[in-house]
């Protein structure tokens, strides 16, 4: 077996010796043969042969490209290989090499079965190439494609390199080549590859560059005949008109055999109006080769107009301006400064000859119309290209620039282009337009097109190309522009198009990677039908512009409602991010003032779409100023800030916002002093009461930090999207845990209002959905005070040090509304902010007295609730308390859960979150034991030993504990079953880690002593004693 493999390897065709002494393969790889050596034969012999052709053939029967056998070459290679093998085998005996054959690479064999997984096989480089080719054939067969197909070189879009390489391969096969010839052919092939990668410069505009694409994307693909009448060019917008000009058959190209990437006219019936000059390398200078079948009609507009008239039997007035987009020649950069000088010298001759040719064409225009109508397109193109050939016969190696001369006929028709170009490293190109006083209606479209072509490239400026949005197909755009009739709208938009180019959403959309600007506001009033059409067809920016124009025209609330609640808008296909963007774009219209609505920059810093993370003193002042600016700038038509506070006016102001979500910018733009704030902020009230600890000061822009975050809204804008679904998104419970649902909101003044300066309070229905029953309680939360009022630090300290208690029990009836007993004005809610659990009765009595004198702060409400509670206390008015129905409802509420942690973004928010949780646990535990004991005594399960201190009791005592608690617990872990994390366990962990640290210190000390002193038996024994210092051998071997 070894001898057979050695024979096969010696007979392998592609193996040759490199200069370095190793064996290399001449079998071409898929990207071209990258192995090149001075001793190897020319690459051109096998440059067109792929390894897929060599599969399954005996190497002895393989033929060269000229048909001669390779057997003679293989015999010579065999002798070389045997000589080398004998010399290598002597060395391998001495050095104990593992491979059986000396000069090969060691490849890993693919595992065909389990026992061959680790087996390696000695494979030569040529054999490995054949293995890869076999694998490629197998994959192509599996995919259902032709397994014998050659690999495509995607870098070469033109066939010039393949044709030249095939010619050179034939030449090299016939003539025996020396090493110098090999080098020349190698250099030529490298130059050809380099030319294909060169980015060509053209005298084209960035908008027209989009038209250069393979004809497989054309809409007339594989059309056998040219259509008699072209579709009229509609003026839907400037961008689609450029595309239609490019795809119209006026600029159909004659067939060219050497350009396989662009099909012929007879097959396609259309083409792009640019022809790339095929560059070839014949000598040192790079030249532009003009094919005889190729048509360069940049000098003359007359022949193009005659050509278009012959193609169209019924000539429409819209086709006149199509003549202007003549085919512009591309220039390739010269190699040296000499070529630039020669080109500048020849430039004047070219201009003069071009003028003469254009004059001749002016005289013979009538003849051309009669002749071109009867001849096919290819003959016309050949005749037209003869004029260009006369110019080029003088010096074909020069790089030439074609200059477009405006003919008299075009200027009489009303417009022409003047193109100026100069030779430099960065070509300066200008597109100018000469309008005439009497302009036709069909020209309004081409005017906007021309104005977008008026781009000037400076030497150092960065030119940003117009990029289509990825969501618009060219076919869809073309069909839309064909289906829209221009008609009456053209007369209205004529003056606008002359004054300014129309902003198309594909250019100025958010999807564009380069440009972003809010859309221009559409002028004129929009009907509902037009509005629905635009909502269905156009992009997101069109919708934003439509709604903004509605608001400028003082549209009614119902119209805005139809826009935002349109089912077609909510059912748009798209990813989650696109839905988010749609919703944010519509909901943030109010928050964008008019001063920067049309600016091409991003949203301002004080926009409500930005959330400020973290808080400093400067941030709060900045946000305070920005909020005041917003209130002055934004439209608050629907809510009258200083109007009456009757419920009717409030309902009228809130009606269109019935389906609004948490964090809508309308809720963040209302002034803080207004009485309607509670009604507009009804959605963010519950979340604010839970996460109010994120701001230490009553700054509304900071307290609504989380409610304006896009995490809360989840990007949905349906009508049925209520607050319940928002909170289910924020706290995704897997079990049927209770959620807080806000049902209605109403304004109620305080019942016993004696002083006129008393603030109003908003009463919110809070519905606690338990596992089976729902108990709704009316709760009371005070509104924010204004910014100007300073905080009383003493009150805050008293409130922080006071001990919290749970709310008092109601009357045993089934009334929902809870009234306080004895008119005591404690604002003690479900939790309080701070307070370590005290273990003596005197501390408890003191804390209860403190709670009667000064109200304790609610963890959910902001710090401002304390001062408002004190003002209520002076009034002795009744307040409705906000607390949960059962113990389960409180323990499983979002207040006690960590589910909201994933929604918080920054480290500051998480830090505040954990700090608040610690305060919640300590405050909750401080009054919990007495509350549970009081519940048990009320149910008769515990004997009445002594009357408990005046505390509150729950609404219902459905929760019955299995184990009675008679004394207040010393640690929070004993009182509540849910809190499993104990301080003692934490201390044990820390003590363990500290013990390990001390042990490491002892070990280091022992090591240092060992290194300093001589190693003796006593020092070793001491170090071993150190390891058992803590009574345990912690993983060490003694």
UniProtKB/Swiss-Prot annotation:
One GO CC term, this protein: cell tip
Location in or out of the cell: Cytoplasm
Bias type Acidic residues, positions: 72-83
Name recorded for this polypeptide: Uncharacterized protein C688.07c
Superkingdom field: Eukaryota
Major localization class: cytoplasm
Keyword set, alphabetical order: Cytoplasm, Phosphoprotein
Signal peptide range in chain numbering: none
Biased composition regions of type Basic and acidic residues, renumbered to the chain: 58-71, 180-198, 426-441, 489-505
GO molecular function, one term: phosphatidylinositol-4,5-bisphosphate binding
Modification Phosphoserine occurs at: 112-114, 436, 618, 856
Keyword field contains Phosphoprotein: yes
Region entry Disordered, spans: 1-100, 144-201, 360-381, 422-441, 454-526, 556-575, 803-864, 940-974, 1005-1024
Gene Ontology biological-process entries: mitotic cytokinesis; mitotic division septum assembly
The keyword Lipid biosynthesis is assigned to this record: no
């Amino acid at each position: 077996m070894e001898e057979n493999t050695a024979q096969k390897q010696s007979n392998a065709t592609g193996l040759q010796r490199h200069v370095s002494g190793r064996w290399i393969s001449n079998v071409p790889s898929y990207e071209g043969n990258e192995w090149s050596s001075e001793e190897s034969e020319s690459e051109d012999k096998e440059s067109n042969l792929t390894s897929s052709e060599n599969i399954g053939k005996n190497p002895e029967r393989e033929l060269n490209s000229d048909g001669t056998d390779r057997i003679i070459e293989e015999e010579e290679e065999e002798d070389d290989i045997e000589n080398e093998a004998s010399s290598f085998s002597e060395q391998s005996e001495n050095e104990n090499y593992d491979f059986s054959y000396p000069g090969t690479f060691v490849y890993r064999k693919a595992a065909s079965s389990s026992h061959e997984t680790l087996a390696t096989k000695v494979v030569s480089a040529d054999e490995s190439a054949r293995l890869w080719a076999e694998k490629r054939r197998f994959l192509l067969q599996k995919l259902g494609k032709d397994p014998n197909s050659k690999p495509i070189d995607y870098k070469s879009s033109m066939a010039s390199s393949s044709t030249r390489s095939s010619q050179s391969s034939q030449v090299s096969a016939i003539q025996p080549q020396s090493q110098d010839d090999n080098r020349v052919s190698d250099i030529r092939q490298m130059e050809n590859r380099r030319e294909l990668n060169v980015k060509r410069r053209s005298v084209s505009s960035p908008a027209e560059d989009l038209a250069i694409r393979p004809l497989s994307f054309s809409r007339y693909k594989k059309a056998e005949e040219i259509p008699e009448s072209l579709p009229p060019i509609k003026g839907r917008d400037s961008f689609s008109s450029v595309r239609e000009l490019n795809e119209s058959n006026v600029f159909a190209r004659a067939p060219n055999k050497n350009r396989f990437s662009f099909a012929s006219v007879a097959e396609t019936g259309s083409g792009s109006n640019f022809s790339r000059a095929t560059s070839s390398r014949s000598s040192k200078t790079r030249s532009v080769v003009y094919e005889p079948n190729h048509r360069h009609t940049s000098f003359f507009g007359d022949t193009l107009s005659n050509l278009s008239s012959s193609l169209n039997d019924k000539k429409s007035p819209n086709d006149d301006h199509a003549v202007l987009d003549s085919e512009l020649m591309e220039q390739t950069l010269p190699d040296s400064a000499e070529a630039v000088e020669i080109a500048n010298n020849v430039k004047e001759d070219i201009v003069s000859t071009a003028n003469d040719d254009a004059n001749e064409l002016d005289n013979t225009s009538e003849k051309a119309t009669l002749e071109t109508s009867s001849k096919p397109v290819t003959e016309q193109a050949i005749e037209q290209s003869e004029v260009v050939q006369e110019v080029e016969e003088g010096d074909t190696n020069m790089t030439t620039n074609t200059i477009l001369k405006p003919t008299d006929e075009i200027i009489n028709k009303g417009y022409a282009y003047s193109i100026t170009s100069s030779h430099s490293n960065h070509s300066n190109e200008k597109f100018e337009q000469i309008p005439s006083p009497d302009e036709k209606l069909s020209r309004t479209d081409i005017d906007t097109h021309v104005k977008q072509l008026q781009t000037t490239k400076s030497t150092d400026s960065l030119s940003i190309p117009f990029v289509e949005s990825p969501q618009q197909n060219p076919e869809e755009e073309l069909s839309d522009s064909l289906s829209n009739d221009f008609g009456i709208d053209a007369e209205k938009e004529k003056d606008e198009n002359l004054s300014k180019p129309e902003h198309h959403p594909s250019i100025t959309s958010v999807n564009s990677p380069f440009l972003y600007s809010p859309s221009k506001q559409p002028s004129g009033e929009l009907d509902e039908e037009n509005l629905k059409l635009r909502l269905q067809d156009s992009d997101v920016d069109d919708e934003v512009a439509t709604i903004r124009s509605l608001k400028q025209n003082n549209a009614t609330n119902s119209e805005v409602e139809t826009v935002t609640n349109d089912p077609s808008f909510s059912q748009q296909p798209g990813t989650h991010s696109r839905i988010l963007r749609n919703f944010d774009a519509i909901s943030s219209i109010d928050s964008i003032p008019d001063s920067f609505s049309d600016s091409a920059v991003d949203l301002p810093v004080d926009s409500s779409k930005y959330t400020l993370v973290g808080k400093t003193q400067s941030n709060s002042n900045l946000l305070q100023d920005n909020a005041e600016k917003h209130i002055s700038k934004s439209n608050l038509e629907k809510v009258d800030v200083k109007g009456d506070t009757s419920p009717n006016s409030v309902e009228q102001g809130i009606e269109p916002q019935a389906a609004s979500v948490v964090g809508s910018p309308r809720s963040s733009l209302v002034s803080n002093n207004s009485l309607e704030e509670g009604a507009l902020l009804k959605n963010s009230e519950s979340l604010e009461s839970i996460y109010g600890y994120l701001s230490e000061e009553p700054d509304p822009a900071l307290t609504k930090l989380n409610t304006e975050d896009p995490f809360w809204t989840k990007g949905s804008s349906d009508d049925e999207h209520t607050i319940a679904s928002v909170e289910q998104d924020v706290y995704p419970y897997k079990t049927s845990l209770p959620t807080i649902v806000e049902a209605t909101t109403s304004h109620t003044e305080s019942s016993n209002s004696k002083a006129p300066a008393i603030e109003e309070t908003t009463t919110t229905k809070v519905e606690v959905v338990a596992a089976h029953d729902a108990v709704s309680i009316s709760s009371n939360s005070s509104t924010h005070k204004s910014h100007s009022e300073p905080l009383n630090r003493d009150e805050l300290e008293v409130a922080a040090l006071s001990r919290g208690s749970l709310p008092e029990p109601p009357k045993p009836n089934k009334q929902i509304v809870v009234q306080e007993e004895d008119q005591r004005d404690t604002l003690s809610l479900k939790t309080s902010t701070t307070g370590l659990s005290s273990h003596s009765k005197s501390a408890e009595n003191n804390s209860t007295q403190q709670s009667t004198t000064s109200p304790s702060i609610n963890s959910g409400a902001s710090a401002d609730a304390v001062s408002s509670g004190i003002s209520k206390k002076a009034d002795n008015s009744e307040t409705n308390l906000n607390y949960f129905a059962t113990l389960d409802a409180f323990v499983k509420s979002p207040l006690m859960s960590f589910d909201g942690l994933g929604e918080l973004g920054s480290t500051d928010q998480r830090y505040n979150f954990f700090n608040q949780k610690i305060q919640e646990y300590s405050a909750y535990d401080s009054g919990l034991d007495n509350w549970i004991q009081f519940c048990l005594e009320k149910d008769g399960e515990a004997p009445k030993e002594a009357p408990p201190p005046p505390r509150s009791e729950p609404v219902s005592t459905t929760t019955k504990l299995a184990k009675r608690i008679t004394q207040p617990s010393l640690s929070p872990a004993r009182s509540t079953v849910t809190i499993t994390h104990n301080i003692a366990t934490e201390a044990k962990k820390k003590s363990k880690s500290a013990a390990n640290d001390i042990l490491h210190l002892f070990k280091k000390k022992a090591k240092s002593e060992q290194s300093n002193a001589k190693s003796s038996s006593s020092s070793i024994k001491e170090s071993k004693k150190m390891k058992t210092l803590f009574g345990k051998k912690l993983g060490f071997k003694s």
